[in-house]
């Protein structure tokens, strides 16, 4: 004590009490203290001494009882919980109950549906076993009543005989209480839980014995008895003490989850079973809808409830447990004895209720077996209460399902099915014919249903398999196919194709593409005929520009003329001559040549008509459109030099024009030269199907001179005459569609595309889609460099506003909204990415980066002297490993390297390979100007080595370790900053800032960078073998004599192709 202050722990020692006892006394006396080390005044200590002397010295002297008492005064919740725990310990009657039940129906009591009790529903659990649950204010009275009644009064004797006359009296004891019994507290009796269904063979024995099977209907009389008990004891209780929660629990009976399934038959038999206790049921009707709760466990092993499955009610003669719980608050009015016990004597009501789909397939039950049990007797009645029937459907429990049911209990409830989806009723004849025998039991039903289900399932699988594996009569091979696509076409497994190719020495996987010869080899083994269609030219027009909706608004449009021909035959000179003669008069500065299409006004029959020329030669657009170039044109002009004759490029142009089915006008140029021989040119053209008109054919041939400007008007007049015959029309009122002539990325204006409108009218602000690119037209510029607001059919304009650069030759179309355009471009981009991944020239595996678009590619253009050399080189290229670099063969053919090949290589960044061939005139200059790599070979091995080296050059170099030398630690010196190793260079050399490893007894103790290297106190860059040096590291000082320092460096090395 100091200055009249006393500490709590000193006072506890003085009084021989614990600190918590003193704190409890302080709390009772309202003395403010915080802990056992708090100080109080001497007067307060004296008061505590006086109070503590009157209290017993025991650990019970604490603040907890006082605190609980005060809490009980405020609310009865805590006291009720303590009371519930004490009552739940009364378990003496249970062995007697179990013994009596096992004596009468030991085989029936194995599959009780229970769920584990929890603390949140202890009130309901007490009610389930018939133990009264008093209020908090009736603790002493309830204990007293329980002691008076005794333990045996809580048990209902199961072997007491049951007859129909006294069933109601026995089961509804609380209803029959006399006036003399009202003075006493009614003690509800413990009711035996319901038993599982029994086989029909036991039904007769159970009827004869008359065993009383209590069910859940006994709860309602007990509940009423509870209410009366509360009324009788109301003068002794305080209304404020009873909590809302307890009142709710005492007034509302909650059925168990299991009863929801087991009471199905009771619900269905409600109309058929009428009892004379209607007034009793009206008294027992609960005020609120009952909520599900949980049964109390028996001491036996609990049998968990199965999850409802897709099933129908049991057969007519099968037994069931009737718990007698009416969710609507009604009681049966006729035969109570049969309702309370097993419903054995009356046949069950035949119902057709919608089945409940289940989330798991633990037990297979045949649909047909279920439908045999369905009848049409009650389908109309159940239509009004379909939801009730769905909830109360009963599923029998099988004895071998104990372990599986535990897993099913915690799963979510199944989704109910609408009654409109249920199958209609079967005819009575069909139902009676398939009626099960009374002697059939659950095991037979399960066995039969399983067999039926397996047979139906196997039959359906066979039908599906036969439908999927239907062989094809003839296979059309148009291009390479993957193994998966070929297997689907042949209706055989993919593994079979992989196995067959593996036996032939070809290793493939399911995603690899097979070339046509390999596909033919596989198909021939199947005995299926093969059809290889002729290769369709890409120049053929596959899409119609005009549609049916355009026929009502067609107008004439200018012709689109494409100039084609061999290199240096005067195509560009002819176009320049036409521009100079017809445009210079109207436009003082001439025509801008920055786009590939332009229009010329031509006078024909006294009227000015417009002709649109497409300047394809020398353009990147023409290179991208080479195979499709003829599709955009209406009239093709073939330029042939009179002094050179027909050349390979001329023949190619003729084939494009025929594939596109466009009229062809031949312009024989350079007739002003001395070496010109137009007749020889006509003769050569006849060999390719072009017969001049003067020789009796239909081919129009006009001799012209671009330099002398001879017969240019005749050529233009012929173009207009041919266009009139073709009757070229379009609908300018519709949304525009056409073709991309060329496209490029401008530094100032962004993506720029030259569009040729073939139908409709293109306007500023339109949403256009070109291939996999879309955008909004911000501005349009015509061939003269002027801005225009709209472009009519056969008009070529430059368009600004696209989000990306489209591919030359792509078709464009205008859409009404941007959302639709974005969806289409996304779909096309995905398809384009997939086609690029699947486009392969070898059988190498597709790497992961190929699927993600990160695969490196090497583009090749192959030209050879003969076709046999080309085939040999292509076969050799397929053998190169292509897991990391994909080899793309863009073009292969026999002949010389032309300027067109140079343009294609420049556009696609390809390498041109020439094998025993030459370069055409002008091709080498074009290659130098475009920066195209042209390789020429005459030995195939050298060619393959160089291609493999080029593929390896695309790979990222790998880092390898290169050793520098070894150093031995011979002395260790300690300095202020740490330790320095005195070393001797054994071999090689050691370099400052190189990577090192320190080994001690063969184990690595440190890895890092050599920070400091000195020789004779001088910093040096390197020390060679045979010299001493000092070595130190910033973060390593644990040196030991004899350590070996390995110095090395990382260098890059060219990677090899992995097989």
UniProtKB/Swiss-Prot annotation:
InterPro entries: EF-G-like_DII, IF2_II, IF2_N, P-loop_NTPase, Small_GTP-bd, T_Tr_GTP-bd_dom, TF_IF2_bacterial-like, TIF_IF2. Its main location: cytoplasm. Keywords: Cytoplasm, GTP-binding, Initiation factor, Nucleotide-binding, Protein biosynthesis. One of its GO terms (molecular function) is GTP binding. GO terms for cellular component: cytosol. Residues 55-81, 93-394, 418-468 are annotated as: Disordered. Residues 55-75, 107-126, 202-211, 274-284 have a biased composition (Polar residues). It is found in: Cytoplasm. This is Translation initiation factor IF-2.
């Amino acid at each position: 004590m100091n200055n009249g202050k006393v500490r709590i722990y000193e006072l506890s020692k003085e009084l021989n009490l614990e600190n918590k006892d003193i704190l409890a006394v302080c709390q009772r006396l309202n003395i403010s203290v915080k802990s056992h080390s708090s100080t109080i005044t001497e007067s307060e200590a004296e008061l505590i001494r006086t109070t503590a002397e009157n209290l017993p010295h025991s650990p019970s002297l604490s603040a907890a009882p006082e605190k609980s008492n005060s809490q009980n005064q405020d609310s009865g919740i805590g006291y009720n919980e303590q009371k519930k725990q004490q009552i739940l310990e009364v378990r003496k009657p249970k062995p007697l109950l179990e013994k009596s039940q096992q004596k009468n129906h030991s085989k029936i009591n194995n599959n009780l549906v229970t769920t584990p009790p929890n603390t949140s529903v202890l009130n309901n659990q007490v009610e389930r076993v018939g133990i009264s649950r008093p209020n908090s204010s009736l603790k002493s009275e309830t204990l007293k009543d329980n002691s008076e009644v005794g333990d045996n009064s809580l048990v209902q004797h199961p072997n007491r005989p049951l007859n129909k006359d006294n069933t109601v009296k026995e089961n509804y004891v609380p209803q029959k209480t006399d006036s003399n019994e009202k003075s006493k507290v009614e003690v509800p009796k413990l009711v035996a839980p319901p038993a599982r269904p029994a086989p029909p063979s036991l039904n007769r024995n159970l009827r004869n014995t008359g065993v009383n099977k209590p069910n859940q209907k006994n709860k309602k009389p007990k509940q009423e008895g509870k209410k009366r008990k509360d009324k009788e004891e109301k003068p002794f209780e305080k209304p404020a003490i009873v909590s809302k929660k307890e009142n709710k629990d005492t007034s509302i009976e909650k059925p168990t989850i299991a009863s929801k399934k087991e009471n199905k038959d009771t619900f269905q038999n409600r109309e058929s079973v009428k009892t004379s206790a209607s007034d009793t049921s009206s008294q027992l009707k609960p005020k609120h809808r009952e909520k599900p709760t949980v049964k109390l466990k028996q001491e036996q092993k609990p049998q968990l409830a199965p999850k409802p499955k897709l099933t129908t009610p049991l057969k007519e003669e099968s037994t069931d447990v009737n718990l007698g719980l009416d969710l609507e608050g009604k009681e049966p009015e006729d035969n109570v004895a049969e309702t309370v016990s097993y419903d054995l004597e009356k046949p069950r009501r035949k119902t057709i209720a919608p089945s409940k789909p289940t989330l798991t397939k633990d037990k297979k039950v045949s649909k047909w077996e279920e439908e045999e049990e369905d009848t049409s007797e009650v389908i109309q009645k159940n239509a009004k209460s379909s939801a009730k029937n769905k909830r109360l459907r009963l599923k029998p429990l099988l004895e071998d399902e104990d372990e599986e049911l535990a897993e099913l209990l915690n799963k979510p409830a199944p989704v109910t099915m609408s009654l409109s989806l249920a199958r209609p009723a079967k005819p009575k004849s069909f139902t009676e014919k398939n009626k099960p025998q009374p002697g059939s039991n659950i095991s037979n039903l399960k066995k039969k249903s399983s067999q039926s289900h397996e047979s139906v399932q196997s039959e359906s699988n066979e039908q599906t398999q036969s439908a999927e594996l239907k062989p094809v009569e003839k296979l059309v091979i148009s291009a390479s196919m993957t193994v998966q696509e070929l297997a689907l076409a042949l209706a055989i497994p993919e593994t079979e194709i992989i196995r067959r190719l593996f036996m032939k020495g070809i290793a493939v996987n399911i995603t690899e593409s097979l070339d046509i010869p390999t596909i033919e080899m596989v198909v021939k083994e199947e005995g299926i005929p093969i059809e290889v269609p002729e290769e369709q030219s890409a120049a053929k027009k596959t899409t119609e520009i005009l549609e049916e909706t355009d026929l009502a608004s067609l107008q004439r449009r200018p012709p689109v003329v494409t100039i084609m021909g061999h290199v240096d035959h005067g195509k560009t000179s002819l176009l320049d001559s036409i521009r100079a003669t017809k445009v210079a008069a109207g436009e003082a500065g001439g025509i801008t040549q920055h786009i590939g299409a332009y229009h010329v006004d031509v006078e024909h029959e006294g009227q000015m008509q417009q002709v649109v020329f497409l300047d394809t030669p020398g353009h990147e657009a023409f290179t991208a459109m080479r195979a499709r170039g003829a599709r955009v044109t209406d009239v093709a002009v073939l330029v042939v030099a009179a002094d050179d004759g027909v050349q390979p490029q001329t023949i190619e142009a003729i084939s494009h024009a025929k594939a596109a089915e466009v009229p062809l006008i031949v312009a024989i140029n350079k007739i002003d030269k001395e070496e010109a021989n137009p007749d020889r040119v006509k003769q050569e053209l006849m060999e390719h199907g072009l017969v001049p008109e003067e020789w009796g054919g239909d081919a129009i041939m006009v001799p012209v001179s671009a330099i002398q400007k001879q017969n240019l008007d005749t050529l233009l007049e012929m173009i207009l005459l041919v266009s009139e015959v073709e009757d070229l029309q379009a609908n300018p009122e519709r949304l525009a569609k056409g073709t991309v002539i060329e496209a490029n990325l401008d530094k100032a204006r962004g993506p720029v595309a030259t569009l040729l409108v073939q139908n409709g009218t293109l306007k500023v602000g339109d949403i256009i889609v070109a291939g996999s690119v879309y955008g909004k037209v911000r501005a349009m510029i015509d061939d003269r460099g002027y801005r225009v607001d709209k472009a009519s059919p056969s008009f070529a304009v430059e368009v600004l506003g696209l989000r990306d650069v489209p591919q030359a030759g792509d078709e464009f179309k205008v859409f009404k909204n941007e959302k639709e355009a974005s969806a289409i471009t996304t779909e096309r981009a995905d398809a384009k990415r997939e086609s690029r991944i699947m486009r392969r020239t070898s059988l190498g595996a597709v790497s992961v980066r190929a699927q993600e678009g990160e695969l490196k590619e090497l583009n090749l253009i192959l030209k050879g002297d003969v076709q046999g050399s080309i085939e040999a080189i292509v076969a050799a290229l397929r053998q190169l490993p292509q897991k990391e670099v994909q080899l793309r063969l863009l073009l292969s053919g026999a002949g010389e390297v032309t300027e067109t090949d140079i343009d294609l290589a420049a556009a696609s960044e390809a390498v041109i390979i020439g094998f025993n061939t030459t370069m055409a005139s002008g091709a080498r200059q074009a290659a130098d100007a475009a920066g195209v790599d042209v390789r020429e070979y005459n030995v195939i091995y050298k060619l393959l080595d160089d291609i493999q080296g080029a593929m390896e050059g695309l790979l990222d170099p790998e880092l390898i370790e290169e050793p520098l030398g070894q150093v031995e630690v011979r002395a260790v010196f300690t300095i202020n900053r740490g330790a320095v190793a005195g070393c001797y260079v054994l071999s090689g050399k050691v370099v400052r800032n190189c990577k090192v490893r320190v080994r001690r007894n063969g184990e690595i103790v440190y890895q890092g960078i050599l920070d400091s290297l000195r020789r004779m106190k001088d910093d040096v860059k390197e020390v060679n073998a045979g010299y001493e040096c000092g070595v130190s590291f910033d973060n390593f000082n644990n040196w030991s004599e004899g350590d070996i320092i390995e110095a090395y460096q990382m260098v890059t090395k060219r990677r090899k192709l992995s097989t």
